[in-house]
Curated annotation (Swiss-Prot):
Record organism: Xenopus tropicalis (Western clawed frog)
Region (Disordered) location: 139-401
Amino acid composition bias (Acidic residues), ranges on this chain: 386-401
Protein name: Serine/threonine-protein phosphatase 4 regulatory subunit 2
Record's function text: Regulatory subunit of serine/threonine-protein phosphatase 4 (PP4).
Domain of life: Eukaryota
Oligomer status and interactors: Serine/threonine-protein phosphatase 4 (PP4) occurs in different assemblies of the catalytic and one or more regulatory subunits.
Biased composition regions of type Polar residues, renumbered to the chain: 139-149, 156-170, 183-203, 339-349, 373-385
C-alpha cells in the first residue's frame, strides 16, 4: 500500500469541515483487517478511526433499534448512548495503536459478520478496546521480520509486523522470551513514558545468554566431579596417614628432648646392674674356689691311705713320698691360684663390658668352674700315680739287697 497517498488522504480528511467516509481510507482499514499491519502512526489515522467507529455503531442501531425479548438477568443492561460514549472515550484516550487493531478493523469493515444485536455488538467492541498494550507501525522500523500479530497473538507470516509493545494506559503485557529486538529510527514516547526500557532489552537478552552458558558449564562440571570422587578420597586418606605418622615422630622427639633426666636415670640403672652382676660373679668365684679346695681334700684322702700302707713297708720310702707329694701339692696350688686370677680378671672385664649378658656370663663361669674341678682332679690323680711310681722305685733296690 502506498504510504504517501495514504498520508495525503488522511490530511484531506482532517481539513474537511464535513466528515465523510473515504473509499481510500476504507481500503486502508480493510488492509489492516487482513494483514494486521499499520503503515502509519496512530495519531495520523486516529481521527478517521474514531469517525468510522461512531458511524458503524449508529448504523447498527438503525438497522436493529429494539431488543427482542426480556433482557438477560445475568448481564447488566446499559443504554446504547452510555455504552457508545464509554467506547469512544476509551479509544480517544489511546496514545498508541492498540494491539487489537486488526480485530477492531474487522468489526468496522464487516460488523454483521458475527453479531446481529446492537447490545452484543457494543459489548464485542468494548472488549477489544479495553486493552493497555500497543504496537508500532512497520514504517518506523529499520527492517521487517517474519512475525505478524492478529488480535494480540503473534504468528509467522511474510509481511511486516509490529513486534514492539509499550505501555498505553497501564502496565505492559508479558513479553515472549526469545523475541527479536529492533531499534527505532527516531526516539518516541508512549503515554508520557520514555522508550528507554524497550532499547535496553537487547542487553537483557545478552545477560540471559551468559547466565544460560554459565549454568551449562556448571552442569558439566557437576557431571565430571563424581568420576574423580573416589580418587580424591584415596588421596585424602593417604595424606591423613602421613600427617599422623609425622605427628607421632615429632611427639617422640619432643618427649626425648623434654625428658633428658629419664635417659640419665636409665644409664645409671644400667651401671648399677653391671656392678651388681660383677659382685655376684665374685661371690660365685669364691664359692667355686671353696668347692675346689674341698674336692682337693677329698681326693687327698686315698693318697694318704696308700702312703700309710707303703709306710708300713718302709719308713724311708714313706718320707720320700710325702716330700714329693707335698712338693707336687704346692706346685698344683700355685698353678690353680694363677688360673683363678686369670679367670677373675677375664670375668671382671666381661661383666663391665655388657651388664645385660649377666646370665650368659654366669653360665660361662659355671662351665669354667667345672673345667677347673676337672683339672684339679687330673692334677690330683697325677701325683698319686707319681707316688705309686716312687714307691715302686725304692722297692727294686731292696729286692736286690
Amino acid at each position: 500500500m502506498d504510504v504517501d497517498r495514504l498520508q495525503e488522504a488522511l490530511k484531506d480528511f482532517e481539513k474537511r469541515g464535513k466528515k465523510e467516509a473515504s473509499s481510500e481510507l476504507d481500503q486502508f482499514l480493510c488492509h489492516v483487517a487482513k494483514t494486521g499491519e499499520t503503515v502509519v502512526q496512530w495519531p495520523q489515522f486516529k481521527e478517521y478511526f474514531v469517525f468510522k467507529l461512531e458511524k458503524v455503531m449508529d448504523d447498527f442501531r438503525s438497522s436493529a433499534p429494539d431488543q427482542r425479548g426480556s433482557p438477560n438477568p445475568n448481564v447488566e443492561y446499559i443504554p446504547f448512548d452510555e455504552m457508545k460514549q464509554r467506547i469512544l472515550k476509551i479509544v480517544t484516550g489511546f496514545n498508541g495503536t492498540p494491539f487489537t487493531i486488526q480485530r477492531l478493523c474487522e468489526l468496522l469493515t464487516d460488523p454483521r459478520r458475527n453479531y446481529t444485536g446492537t447490545d452484543k455488538f457494543l459489548r464485542g467492541v468494548e472488549k477489544n478496546v479495553m486493552v493497555v498494550s500497543c504496537v508500532y507501525p512497520s514504517s518506523e522500523k529499520n527492517s521487517s521480520t517474519s512475525l505478524n500479530r492478529m488480535n494480540g497473538v503473534m504468528f509467522p507470516s511474510n509481511s511486516q509486523s509490529y513486534t514492539d509493545r509499550s505501555n498505553v494506559n497501564g502496565p505492559g503485557t508479558p513479553r515472549p522470551v526469545n523475541r527479536p529486538k529492533f531499534s527505532l529510527s527516531s526516539p518516541m514516547t508512549t503515554n508520557g513514558l520514555p522508550d528507554s526500557m524497550e532499547n535496553n532489552e537487547s542487553d537483557l537478552q545478552q545477560k540471559e545468554k551468559s547466565q544460560s552458558d554459565s549454568v551449562a558449564s556448571e552442569d558439566e562440571s557437576q557431571a565430571t566431579t563424581p568420576k574423580n570422587k573416589h580418587s580424591a578420597e584415596d588421596s585424602a586418606e593417604t595424606e591423613e596417614h602421613e600427617v599422623k605418622r609425622l605427628k607421632f615422630d615429632t611427639e617422640e622427639e619432643e618427649a626425648a628432648c623434654a625428658n633428658p633426666d629419664a635417659s640419665s636415670e636409665v644409664s645409671t640403672e644400667m651401671a648399677e646392674e653391671a656392678e651388681s652382676a660383677s659382685a655376684s660373679a665374685d661371690k660365685d668365684k669364691e664359692s667355686c674356689q671353696s668347692a675346689q679346695a674341698a674336692d682337693e681334700e677329698s681326693l687327698m684322702t686315698p693318697s694318704e691311705s696308700t702312703e700309710a700302707d707303703s709306710g708300713e713297708r718302709d719308713s724311708e720310702t714313706v718320707s720320700v713320698t710325702e716330700e714329693s707329694s707335698e712338693e707336687s701339692h704346692q706346685m698344683e696350688e700355685s698353678e690353680q691360684s694363677e688360673t683363678a686370677c686369670s679367670l677373675n680378671s677375664e670375668e671382671q672385664n666381661s661383666a663391665a663390658a655388657a651388664a645385660s649378658t649377666v646370665g650368659t656370663d654366669t653360665s660361662e663361669e659355671e662351665h669354667l668352674g667345672t673345667f677347673g674341678v676337672k683339672s684339679t682332679e687330673t692334677l690330683t690323680l697325677s701325683p698319686m700315680e707319681n707316688s705309686e711310681e716312687a714307691t715302686d722305685a725304692p722297692e727294686e733296690p731292696m729286692d736286690q739287697d
